[in-house]
């Protein structure tokens, strides 16, 4: 997934879940990792990082 799609997905997740979005993304990443899907786990880690950045900006 390219960077723009990751950011867009993070925005939608943040809009839907607010401050819980980062935890939601982390859970998805863990679930994919547990299932052996490291590619999707990496995508969700990137989404989590993007949500984290959004939360930091939102708190300022």
Q: Positions of the model-derived regions?
A:
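N-terminal cationic and glycine-rich segments that engage phosphates or anionic surfaces
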Residues: 49
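Short, charged, amphipathic alpha-helical segments
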Residues: 38, 42-46
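Long, non-catalytic architectural segments outside compact domain cores
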Residues: 1-27, 31, 35, 39, ...
